[in-house]
Amino acid sequence: MRLNTLSPAEGSKKAGKRLGRGIGSGLGKTGGRGHKGQKSRSGGGVRRGFEGGQMPLYRRLPKFGFTSRKAAITAEVRLSDLAKVEGGVVDLNTLKATNIIGIQIEFAKVILAGEVTTPVTVRGLRVTKGARAAIEAAGGKIEE
């Protein structure tokens, strides 16, 4: 076997439809679009969700909920990320300095994900119960 003798398995590569290439191809002239009508035209077709003039589903259903603006400026910090902070003191500014959270973040919460091995001091961040227990078990402390 050589590289120049390799070929794909029989039937695995299906040729694409060649539209408008004569009557004998079966896809000549109208190219499978039929005669006249909106869908036969170039650029023809209806927009997504259009139901022929009937009141569409997205307008029949009621509006609900909202997008919290606070969610965009809030971040979750994993326990395993705390080890990346130099100096052992973790607060909002040190997290931003080490690129663990973005500069636009104003609130952060430490969650129980991963492990913390070195003792760290968490200052001014919210901490879940499980994360609090893990930090204290590793010899760290939480300052409000």
Swiss-Prot record:
Residues 21-31 have a biased composition (Gly residues). GO terms for biological process: translation. GO terms for molecular function: rRNA binding; structural constituent of ribosome. Residues 1-54 are annotated as: Disordered. One of its GO terms (cellular component) is cytosolic large ribosomal subunit. PANTHER family: 50S RIBOSOMAL PROTEIN L15 (PTHR12934), LARGE RIBOSOMAL SUBUNIT PROTEIN UL15M (PTHR12934:SF11). Belongs to the universal ribosomal protein uL15 family. This is Large ribosomal subunit protein uL15. It comes from Salmonella arizonae (strain ATCC BAA-731 / CDC346-86 / RSK2980).
